[in-house]
Structure formats: structure tokens, C-alpha cells
Design a protein with these regions (language model features):
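PLP-dependent enzyme catalytic core of the Aspartate aminotransferase-like
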Residues: 2, 90, 94, 118, ...
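Active-site C-terminal subdomain of aminotransferase-like
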Residues: 230-233, 240, 245-350, 357, ...
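N-terminal "arm"/small-domain region of PLP-dependent enzymes with the aminotransferase-like
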Residues: 2-21, 25, 29-98, 232
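Conserved N-terminal alpha-helix of the aminotransferase class I/II PLP-enzyme fold
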Residues: 86, 90-134
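Short, structured coil segments at secondary-structure junctions
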Residues: 149, 169-171, 261, 342
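Conserved PLP-anchoring active-site segment centered on the Schiff-base-forming lysine
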Residues: 142-161
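Active-site phosphate-binding strand-loop segment of PLP-dependent enzymes
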Residues: 175, 179-236
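Conserved PLP-binding catalytic core of the aspartate aminotransferase-like
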Residues: 48, 325-336, 342-376, 385-387, ...
Length: 444
């Protein structure tokens, strides 16, 4: 016997006797906080877990001073819309956060939940919809509910973390194709088709309508067209497309005019709706299957009434005020064209999500963002290693309907000034010590 268990028949016993049990909590204590947590002393409260204060919008306070904020998915500006705030308040006063008590299958069903589902399904062009308590949890639950160990999944390599976590629960075979590479998708579909002939299962293809980091679109129409050659069920996560893409904001599948070819459509309330919760929609038999088999909804409390009442008002505003979406796209086009005119790399975004790509390490990224926030009073999100490859920086800008063209012009000028400093090497210094622990020490 060789390898892990040694070179003799007794090697198995010998090496098992010498395996040292590890305490889980000690392992966590000794691993320096994980790939991102290792920076906690530098990042917490500033680069990670920053505290933005005030009404949600383009102007908020960060550490006591006003900043121009480009870091919220409040696409249509509904978070502080007076009618939305009023609906949220009415829901809280009339029903409270406790209502309805229990899971919907047992005691948590209301006519308002049913009305919201009917209206959502009609808006996105599907037969029925089912409310989910949270988007992240909802996607995990959809995947878990759909699949058996006999099934195969084919998914985009840049799928959101909620999709990846859902796939981790799947005990069958998984096939991944490079981001938006349709030729490779065909190859993986062929492999999956051969596999399920042996297992007696089916194939699920998963992608996103709008990819939230890069802003590019999933090639939904091309994937739907592949149904002529392959038998599969198509699941689309359209979290960033709902309310922003397609005619009347009905989503990315409508943008591509292929909604009938999307079998399972997922959307969240956390972006354009500026709320909490999510929904999945499709044919009635499928949604009924989810209602009676999705464990995260069977064994969890129903979505609270203030969120349901608030969601009804938000949907009404999306349906009746196309000018909000038009304004979003006016700001988006001005921002993205401005970056292109100044020769910034914003990749292949076709949505409001605007990534600005720069070159540099963690130190340069943190010093650049520190400069934006402290010198220019401009707040945006930064992504760097280990989330993306070493040497890359992404500054993620999210335009909204409540930003102004003056905000766009100011931001473009700020980025131009920071790029000049980056190219001169002025950000090649130690990470700034601005985490809460240092901030609090200085305040004493």
C-alpha cells in the first residue's frame, strides 16, 4: 500500500493513529480571518463594513461628512420616494412586523401576498410567481428544489455566489463554461446530454440576465435557441435586470424578446425595488411545485406584511412611471460615454452597472479609494485581490435615477485626477490605517 496510508499493509493503521484532530474554532482562529478577513485591521469600518448614514441616495454621510455616493443598487430612486416611505409606514402601523405569523403553508398566507404574486407574474410575462423571503436564500432554494442527484447542471463561470452556493448542495454532476462562451456551452451541453442518458436525469442551465460585477448581459436569446438541439430547463437570475432592462423594465429576457424560452425566472426586490425579498416565476405547475416543496419557505416565516405592502407600491410605481427608468438610462449613458471619452476601461457593460478597470495591487487600490473618499468626498465600491486576480482593480459605479448630470461630470473629473496619481506611482505606499480601530483611537 502506498500514498497517504504508507507503503505497508500496516500503513493504514499507522497513519490513522498519527492523524491529529483539529479543533474547528482553533482552526478559524489561526487562519488569519480568511482571504478577505486577513485585512480586517486595515479595512473594517472603512473599506469593508463602512457605515453610510442619512437618507438613502446620492448624498449620504460617511464618517461625519457628506459624500457623493455611487455604491447603492437604488436604480430607480425608490428607496426614499415619498409614496414608498408612506406605504412602508402604513404596512408597519396596520400590521406590524410580526404579521403574518408562521410559514405560508401553515398560517402565514394573506390576500396581499397572493395579489403581489399575481401582479409580479403579469408584469414579467409569466403564468405565476412565488414570493421568497430573501434573494440569496431564494436562489439556493430554487436550485435545491429543482434538482435530483440524477440531474446535471451547466452554468456560467461568473455566476453569482448564491448560484454557486446552490450548486454546492447538488449531489449530481456540474459542468461549467467560460463566461458567455456559447461554443463552450454547446460542448458542455453535449457532455451533460451523454451523462443524463446514463443517469436518467435532466439538464438545468443557469446564467444571469445582467452580471452584477461587469454589467454585461447573459446571452439569453442564444441559449434559448440551443433548445432546438438540446433538451434542458433554463433558469435565469435577473436580479439586476428587473426594473432596468427591456420594455417597461420587465427584465433582460424581454430585452432579448425570449421570455417564453426562460423556464424559471428569478428576480429580487433588493435592487430596483429598493426593498427586501424576491420571487421566482414560471408556469403554474412549476410554481405550485415550489410552493409545496421548497423547504426554505415551508419551514420559514412568511414575508412580513410591511415588506409586502411596500413591494406592491414599488411595483405600481415601476409600472406607472417609465420616466424613472428613462432618467436612470440618461445618467447611465452620460456616465459611461464620459468614461469612454476619457479613455477609461469600462469593459463590455450593457447595463447601468459601470465597472472602471485599473491596474494595481491591494495597496494602490486602498490608497486610491482613500483619496476618492477623503480628498474628493466621493464614495464607490472597490474590488481587488483576492476577489479578482492580482494586479487588477475594479471601481464599481452604480448610477441611479436620482443622480444628476453634474454628479456625473464631477465624478469623471475626480477619476481623471486619481488615475494621474496612480500612473505616477503616488499610491504605491502602505495601506492607509483608517479602519475603525485606528479611527476610534484617534478620537480618544
Amino acid at each position: 500500500m502506498s500514498g497517504l496510508f504508507g507503503d505497508s499493509p500496516n500503513g493504514l493503521i499507522y497513519n490513522l493513529k498519527n492523524i491529529i484532530q483539529v479543533n474547528i474554532l482553533e482552526r478559524i482562529r489561526n487562519n488569519s480571518g480568511g482571504p478577505i478577513g486577513q485585512y480586517i485591521d486595515y479595512a473594517h469600518g472603512y473599506f469593508a463594513f463602512p457605515k453610510l448614514e442619512g437618507d438613502i441616495g446620492p448624498r449620504m454621510k460617511f464618517r461625519g461628512k457628506e459624500v457623493l455616493n455611487w455604491s447603492l443598487n437604488n436604480y430607480l430612486g425608490l428607496a426614499n420616494h415619498p409614496e414608498v416611505r408612506k406605504a412602508d409606514a402604513i404596512g408597519a402601523v396596520e400590521f406590524g412586523m410580526a404579521a403574518p405569523m408562521g410559514a405560508r403553508m401553515m398560517s402565514g398566507q394573506t390576500k396581499y401576498h397572493e395579489e403581489l404574486e399575481r401582479r409580479l407574474a403579469k408584469f414579467v410575462g409569466k403564468k405565476d410567481a412565488f414570493l421568497l423571503n430573501f434573494g440569496y436564500q431564494g436562489m439556493i432554494s430554487i436550485i435545491d428544489c429543482l434538482l435530483t442527484r440524477r440531474d446535471a447542471v451547466v452554468y456560467d463561470s461568473e455566476a453569482h455566489a448564491c448560484i454557486i452556493d446552490g450548486l454546492r448542495m447538488h449531489m449530481g454532476k456540474r459542468f461549467v463554461y467560460p463566461h458567455n462562451d456559447m461554443e463552450r456551452l454547446r460542448v458542455e451541453l453535449a457532455r451533460a446530454s451523454e451523462l443524463v442518458k446514463e443517469t436518467g436525469g435532466g439538464i438545468l442551465v443557469i446564467t444571469e440576465g445582467v452580471f452584477g460585477m461587469k454589467g454585461d448581459l447573459g446571452k439569453l436569446d442564444e441559449i434559448v435557441a440551443m433548445k432546438k438541439d438540446f433538451d434542458f430547463t433554463f433558469l435565469v437570475d435577473d436580479a439586476h435586470g428587473f426594473g432596468t432592462m427591456g420594455p417597461d423594465g420587465r427584465g433582460t429576457a424581454h430585452h432579448f424578446n425570449c421570455v417564453d424560452g426562460v423556464d424559471v425566472l428569478f428576480n429580487t426586490f433588493a435592487k430596483s425595488m429598493a426593498g427586501i425579498g424576491a420571487f421566482v416565476c414560471g408556469d403554474k405547475y412549476l410554481i405550485d411545485f415550489f410552493r409545496y416543496n421548497m423547504r426554505s419557505q415551508q419551514f420559514a416565516k412568511s414575508l412580513p406584511m410591511p415588506m409586502v405592502i411596500g413591494a406592491l407600491k414599488r411595483l405600481e410605481l415601476i409600472e406607472t412611471h417609465p420616466e424613472y427608468r428613462e432618467r436612470l438610462w440618461t445618467i447611465t449613458r452620460a456616465l459611461q460615454q464620459g468614461f469612454r471619452d476619457k479613455v477609461f476601461d469600462i469593459g463590455g457593460t450593457l447595463s447601468p452597472v459601470t465597472p472602471v478597470y485599473m491596474k494595481g495591487g491591494v495597496n494602490e487600490a486602498t490608497n486610491l479609494v482613500y483619496d476618492l473618499r477623503e480628498r474628493f468626498n466621493l464614495f464607490c465600491s472597490v474590488v481587488t485581490y483576492p476577489v479578482i486576480p492580482k494586479g487588477e482593480i475594479i471601481l464599481r459605479i452604480i448610477p441611479t435615477a436620482v443622480h444628476t448630470l453634474e454628479d456625473v461630470e464631477y465624478t469623471l473629473n475626480c477619476f481623471e485626477a486619481c488615475r494621474e496619481k496612480l500612473l505616477k506611482g503616488e499610491y504605491q505606499k502602505e495601506m492607509p490605517r483608517v479602519a475603525d480601530k485606528y479611527f476610534e483611537e484617534q478620537a480618544k
